[in-house]
Amino acid sequence: MNIEVNFCHNMEHFGAFEENPKLAIAVSGGTDSLALMLLVKHWNEKVKGEITVLTIDHHLRSESTSEADYVSSICQNIKLQHVTLHWIHKGITGNIQAQARKARYHLLTNYCQEHDILHLITGHHADDIVENFFIRLLRGAGLAGLSSHNIFFVNNVRIIRPLFNITKQDLKKYLEQQNIKWINDPSNNSNKYLRTQVRDLLKSMLISFQNNFTVELLKKRIMLSQMHLTRALDSVNNEIIHYVVYAVKIYSAGFAVIDRKLFRQASPEARYAILSYLLMIVGANTKPQRFSSLQHIILHDIQEYNTYKTLHGCIVEYSIQYIIIYREFGRCYPRSKVVSNSVVWDYRFKVVDNRKNNRMNLTIDYLKKSDYHLIKSYVESNQRNAYFNYSRKILFTFPVIKHLEKVIAIPHIKYYSDKTIQESVSFVFEPKLISRWFHYC
């Protein structure tokens, strides 16, 4: 099949677009993204959308700025709008590729949000999918990790990957036909990165298979397996939604409660997924916990009560009826912050400050045990408060408002020693992980 026809068919796979859609394409100047840009331009002749090409200058190599300029020159020649976004940093240590990827999505999706662009199209081709499968397999990934989705949301921006069944070799041939030169990133061939090591491993595997396997056949087999895994994952996702609705409550005060009896009726895969999501939401994490740790929590649930475990920045407490998950500060308590609009405390609570006249200096902090005696009588007279039905310890994870080191408000339990604060300052629970599956009580 002609690559342009194949690409247009793939775009139809993602469903109908709105009339004259606003589209962004992530283009680095490499084979994949340049071919993607030309294919989107061809497809757009019928759709009549507004295209913006976005290039990230990571400032990690001396050539990065000239490479962004090269993409800009091509866009000028084919009459596409181009914008270069800059990753400003003070030198990177640790996992450079992971940090660069995180920065890319942050910059790209922020630009899309600021310019009312819903669709961000990225170059993620068949070879990438095969390599990702093996990388995740080596890391012991579960069903969700081994399956592959070509459409998902980041920061409320719709990420589309339409090259999922097109190989890198086909993309190179297409660019040669269009007489477009591409940029070779030397890091793609560096053996210090796991992706390059996996690529070499696949080549050696094919050599050992001799004539029984070809590269294309291997890719097709793996993509077929991923289709089956994705279909199985969709089924599990439906189960997850069911048990999130009936067995889970997430409170806007930043903790979660699971009905143990109902939760045990779910499949192990659904339970692992739900626990993983809850630990990320409550613990202010962006990455899931390892399977082995979650397995320990699941086994503990079968036989224990009136005990607790610590995991992923959370305390997992077991009562006879419930599993209660709340924040564990450990040795790293969140810093106090001055109350003002849009300030985020503990990476989870955003401040809404509607004060107009009385602007006394207020701070957000956690409740210390030494502060508790000031509100003890209020707490004891409000035993029916739903939060206190689970664990009194949860109280010490709530954000409190202080003036001159004195607690004057704990909005989540409706405690106010100053009534003007009740009408003007509040908290909104906004964890790092946001999922359409979860709502807050």
Swiss-Prot record:
Its main location: cytoplasm. It is an enzyme of class 6 (ligase). Keywords: ATP-binding, Cytoplasm, Ligase, Nucleotide-binding, tRNA processing. It holds the Pfam family ATP_bind_3. It is found in: Cytoplasm. One of its GO terms (biological process) is tRNA modification. One of its GO terms (cellular component) is cytoplasm. InterPro entries: Rossmann-like_a/b/a_fold, TilS/TtcA_N, tRNA_Ile_lys_synt, tRNA_Ile_lys_synt_N. ATP binds at residues 28-33. Its EC number is 6.3.4.19. GO terms for molecular function: ATP binding; tRNA(Ile)-lysidine synthase activity. Coiled coil: none annotated. It catalyses: cytidine(34) in tRNA(Ile2) + L-lysine + ATP = lysidine(34) in tRNA(Ile2) + AMP + diphosphate + H(+). The N-terminal region contains the highly conserved SGGXDS motif, predicted to be a P-loop motif involved in ATP binding. Belongs to the tRNA(Ile)-lysidine synthase family. HAMAP family: tRNA_Ile_lys_synt. NCBIfam families: lysidine_TilS_N. Ligates lysine onto the cytidine present at position 34 of the AUA codon-specific tRNA(Ile) that contains the anticodon CAU, in an ATP-dependent manner. Cytidine is converted to lysidine, thus changing the amino acid specificity of the tRNA from methionine to isoleucine. This is tRNA(Ile)-lysidine synthase.
